[in-house]
Design a protein with these regions (language model features):
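Membrane-interfacial helix-loop segments of redox and metal-homeostasis proteins
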Residues: 1-159
Length: 161
């Protein structure tokens, strides 16, 4: 991915997701309620952040998210094609996990966390932008001649030359 507006938007979404996860992690361990995020029974971050689904084997989900966003940010600093593939794969894993958590919020807890919704929006945007940053497979085949004069591209079956 070249360093253009899309690239900087990707970095910004990684930072946004990281900040949302960090705030959610702070709220997870905080004893005081979060007035800004507890609107009613349907939108209640404290309820979601302190539920049994807020941890995976004792590790807060918000910490997993924070580490994931840090990884995506680090991968987004590179313009390598290979790293772009890893970045897209990592974002797909993050999106799948965020969609699972949204399912838990909607159908099991019947409560939504505004920070979690923001994080879902961030990882969705990251996945979209990481996908845009991928180049078509044909770009991986070089058309430059090698030292021995043989071109490294595959023959085109449509060419009749």
């Amino acid at each position: 991915m070249k360093r253009n507006a899309t690239h900087f938007l990707l970095l910004g979404c990684c930072l946004l997701g990281g900040v949302l996860s960090a705030v959610s992690l702070h709220n997870h361990y905080s004893a005081s309620p979060t007035d800004y995020c507890d609107l009613n029974d349907t939108f209640n971050c404290d309820f979601v952040n302190r539920s049994t689904y807020a941890e995976l084997r004792g590790v807060p989900v918000a910490l997993v998210g924070l580490l994931g966003y840090l990884l995506l940010f680090a991968l987004s600093l590179s313009t390598s094609r290979l790293i772009a593939g890893f970045r897209f794969a990592a974002s797909l894993i993050g999106l799948a996990f965020a969609l699972y958590l949204a399912y838990v919020e909607a159908y099991i807890l019947a409560a939504w966390c505004l920070l979690c919704i923001g994080s879902l929006a961030a990882i969705s945007a990251i996945t979209l932008l990481a996908g845009i940053g991928l180049r078509p497979a044909r770009d991986f085949v070089s058309t430059a001649p090698h030292e021995d004069g043989i071109r490294s591209e595959l023959p085109n079956p449509i060419d009749t030359q």
